């Protein structure tokens, strides 16, 4: 009897110990967010941007380093552009086949420009630990819904995350500008669109640049701005649309200083500078642009059709246009500006 009682007590004690061991242990230790690995010291001291795309992408990024280094002279910047006039599906094909068909350009503080031909996107994404990678589709495909629903955008995003040298980069989409068609549209440049392009444009938008712009904005809001993969959407097209509708090209502008477009679809130096300031404000969270510190675009940084004119001095008329256009886009990213063209005075070059 006594042995049975002792055995029962021991069994009860053993079961109690097992139950205690199985119970979850509560802890009051604070939980911590996973830390993002730092870049290497030599990479961390330079803010680095890679732009992937075609001619509209090149227009958008070309003067960004000049703007950043003028506005933030104590910091180091590198802006690279990998260019080939292709749509996204063709870029993806070249990535999969590792085709060396791209022109690669790096721009650093002081308008230092180094170009390298026969490059691959595969090499470019690993060349530096990029802080920001930007992509845009060409202006025309940006108006096609299929461009956003065929899976190519997601494929590129996933591939970049898996293959970039630093996978914690920020990702941005650059929303481009609507295309003018004829010299009658203000601030468009010296050339008109080819007949075939003009026919397609007129068929789809009735030759109305405002309708073209509205379509881009509609699809940006529907597909890109709601996509969590993008940290930024740069509203370059809105800033250009405002400048196009507000600041007219004056007569007697032989050096093409005040034009926004150099042809029927591409930016002039002035247009590129407006877009660069749009990027600057959005990247660094500047809610209102109050001053433009870029005073000169060196001749070697100008578009090919304008290099022969030498350096481009950015006068007060241009600076005011930049400030107004960028601030409009910051406050009204997807809203067409009113058509209130004013006469732009012709000022003598300052230098």
Where are these regions (language model features)?
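C-terminal motif of bacterial Sec signal peptides marking the signal peptidase cleavage site
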Residues: 16-19
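Short hydrophobic segments within beta-strands
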Residues: 50-52, 174
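Alpha-helical cap/lid subdomain in secreted, periplasmic
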Residues: 118-265, 269
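N-terminal low-complexity, Pro/Thr/Ser-rich intrinsically disordered segments
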Residues: 30-48
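Positively charged n-region of N-terminal signal peptides that target proteins for export
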Residues: 1-4, 9
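Conserved SGNH/GDSL esterase-like catalytic core that processes O-acyl groups on lipids
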Residues: 52, 58-150
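Conserved catalytic region of serine esterases and O-acyltransferases that act on ester linkages
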Residues: 255-351
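Bacterial signal peptide processing site
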Residues: 21-23
